């Protein structure tokens, strides 16, 4: 069972070393789940004397006003008889103190290091472990004494600040409260009892200690309180007799003081029947046994909390990403790896693993055919326009059989209008690819760490897409222009035969501009243009996919990679300038994860029975 208190001691020390003081923060706290005994009392209540009596050593700073200005986590470890007793501070891990006057001075010095030489207070605890044959395994937290007025050099808020600090410890359900009250004062006004009842109205966590019993007025005693008939608590009150100021001045040692305490309760008529339940030695043993029971009951819940929190912290740490490499090669590798992840996500969008790529197909299957269908050839093939273009093409020599130049001009003027839908398809696919770049950037978790790299990758990808669009537009419009520059001969070779089948080809050339003839020309041109549209409907998507989609998958960041190879250390570092908030969060999560893993190992190493 003694291992359980040692276990909690180790975890408490790890908590303090890694910044978990149980204060409110955005991080999970292990400190709050650990059972502890907090010592609460007003100034001059005898709180320090009780602690020194339990330890059996003079080691606490003394003086007027507020002496305890930081929580002192006092961890007592029983060692074998005959072994020399010593003390260790968590902040001085390799130094053993055998002179307890030096311990007192170090407590004062460490307090001043945190608070300055003012009379301010701090919630950051000091950890002190004392190893002695004369103690029981016990952990106590000495809190600043409650006060009603501020002294010179202290802020007006000190009274409330101390109360808030004390309350922050004792209001936690795993905290056992040791309420110190002087017997020579009215218990109804006890600061310790008052605040304890506020946070623990049922008294399930509160132990009462009466000090200065030997200083009560003649004719009065504390029997009713100690017997539980007055100011009743769930656990029995314990009376103690501490050294007087005169004893302290005379350097009366603790062994003699404990002996005198035992004799006082044994020899005083009023308390003789309670003697075996009084005194600092009984108090220490009672608290040690109670703390053991509480720890044992809490261990399963602590284990469950630790295991759950470790998983949560590991998940968040993974999401935050790895810390930045220090050397140029490491930085370059990190950037390339992040870019590779982005590129992979972008390809997954195009290949259908992620949503978005289907929009490109929709352009070819719906948007382009619909745009071609909406083209208005009526204007080019209106009767007046056909007559105008045919006669202009003939010049001063009318055509003999078929108005070839007229056909060419009519076809060219109609096919040119296809450039609009072709160009629109290129632009639409470009917009889709840009949107997929932004989506891929947002979905690349690693890019969230580095805002500068995020901007550079986005800009580089968009710049590449812009160049690909220009190449695609040029190639696609060339397809349209090729249809204008060379007509499909086989289509027109059939026209004379059709003419012969339909009538007299030797009809007067002056009658060939009649409406029937012109309509026939218009019909032939429209048939040819429709044939061209059908062909371009298939070839334009191929050109766009080849020049834009395929190239985006192959070489979206090639130019950026080439630039990376020329960057110096300063430029690479600027790309990996991480958001300070993320850096701080990762550092905090790493420390807290280290704490929980250490606690996990400590619990696993202790043999305890459920």
From Swiss-Prot:
| Coiled coil location | none
Q: Give residue numbers for the modification (N-acetylmethionine).
A: 1
Question: Could you tell me which SUPFAM superfamilies the record lists for this protein?
Answer: P-loop containing nucleoside triphosphate hydrolases
Give the region (G5 motif) as residue ranges.
241-244
Query: Which amino acids does the record list as binding GTP?
Result: 44-49, 212-217, 242-245
Q: Which GO terms describe its biological process?
A: cell plate formation involved in plant-type cell wall biogenesis; cellular response to boron-containing substance levels; clathrin-dependent endocytosis; cytokinesis by cell plate formation; embryo development ending in seed dormancy; intracellular protein transport; regulation of endocytosis; regulation of establishment of cell polarity
Q: What is this protein called?
A: Phragmoplastin DRP1A
Q: Which organism is it from?
A: Arabidopsis thaliana
Q: What gene name is listed for this protein?
A: DRP1A
């Amino acid at each position: 069972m003694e291992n359980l208190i040692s276990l909690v001691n180790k975890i408490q020390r790890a908590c303090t070393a890694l910044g978990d003081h149980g204060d409110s923060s955005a991080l999970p706290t292990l400190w709050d789940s650990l059972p502890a005994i907090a010592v609460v009392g007003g100034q001059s209540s005898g709180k320090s004397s009780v602690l020194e009596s339990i330890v059996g050593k003079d080691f606490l700073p003394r003086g007027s006003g507020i002496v305890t200005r930081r929580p002192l986590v006092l961890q007592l470890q029983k060692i074998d008889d005959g072994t020399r007793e010593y003390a260790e501070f968590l902040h001085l891990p390799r130094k053993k103190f055998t002179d307890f006057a030096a311990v007192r001075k170090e407590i004062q010095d460490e307090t001043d290091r945190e608070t300055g030489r003012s009379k301010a207070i701090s919630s950051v605890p000091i950890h002190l472990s004392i190893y002695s044959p004369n103690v029981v395994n016990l952990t106590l937290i000495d809190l600043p004494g409650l006060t009603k007025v501020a002294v010179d050099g202290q802020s007006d808020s000190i009274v409330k600040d101390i109360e808030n600090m004390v309350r922050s410890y004792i209001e936690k359900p795993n905290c056992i409260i040791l309420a110190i009250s002087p017997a020579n004062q009215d218990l109804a006004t006890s600061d310790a009892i008052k605040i304890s009842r506020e946070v623990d109205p049922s008294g399930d966590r509160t132990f009462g200690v009466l000090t200065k019993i030997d200083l009560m007025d003649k004719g009065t005693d504390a029997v009713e309180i100690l017997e539980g008939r007055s100011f009743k608590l769930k656990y029995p009150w314990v009376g103690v007799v501490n050294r007087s100021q005169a004893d302290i001045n005379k350097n009366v040692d603790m062994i003699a003081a404990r002996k005198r305490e035992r004799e006082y309760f044994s020899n005083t008529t009023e308390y003789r029947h309670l003697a075996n339940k009084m005194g600092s030695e009984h108090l220490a043993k009672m608290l040690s046994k109670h703390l053991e029971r509480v720890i044992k009951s809490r261990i399963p819940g602590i284990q469950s909390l630790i295991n759950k929190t470790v998983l949560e912290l590991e998940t968040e740490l993974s999401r935050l990403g790895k810390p930045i490499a220090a050397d140029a090669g490491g930085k370059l590798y990190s950037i390339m790896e992040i870019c590779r992840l982005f590129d992979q996500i972008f390809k997954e969008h195009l290949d259908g693993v992620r949503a978005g790529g289907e929009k490109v197909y929709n352009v070819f299957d719906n948007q382009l055919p619909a745009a071609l269908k909406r083209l208005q050839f009526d204007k080019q093939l209106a009767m007046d326009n056909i007559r105008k273009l045919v006669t202009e093409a003939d010049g001063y020599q009318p055509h003999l059989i078929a108005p070839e130049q007229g056909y060419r001009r009519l076809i060219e003027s109609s096919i040119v209008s296809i450039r609009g839908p072709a160009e629109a398809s290129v632009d639409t696919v470009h917009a889709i690819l840009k949107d997929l770049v932004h989506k891929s950037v947002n979905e690349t978790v690693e890019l969230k760490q580095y805002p500068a790299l995020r901007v550079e990758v986005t800009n580089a990808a968009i710049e590449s897409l812009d160049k690909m669009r220009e190449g695609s537009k040029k190639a696609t419009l060339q397809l349209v222009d090729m249809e204008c520059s060379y007509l499909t001969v086989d289509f027109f070779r059939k026209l004379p035969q059709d003419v012969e089948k339909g009538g007299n080809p030797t009809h007067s050339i002056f009658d060939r501009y009649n409406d029937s003839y012109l309509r026939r020309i218009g019909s032939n041109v429209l048939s040819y243009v429709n044939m061209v549209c059908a062909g371009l409907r298939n070839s334009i998507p191929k050109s766009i996919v080849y020049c834009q989609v395929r190239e985006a998958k192959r070489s979206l960041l090639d130019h950026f990679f080439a630039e990376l190879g020329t960057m110096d250390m300063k430029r690479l570092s600027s790309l990996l300038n991480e958001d300070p908030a993320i850096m701080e969060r990762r550092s905090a999560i790493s420390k807290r994860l280290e704490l929980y893993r250490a606690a996990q190992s400590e619990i696993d190493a202790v043999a305890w029975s459920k």
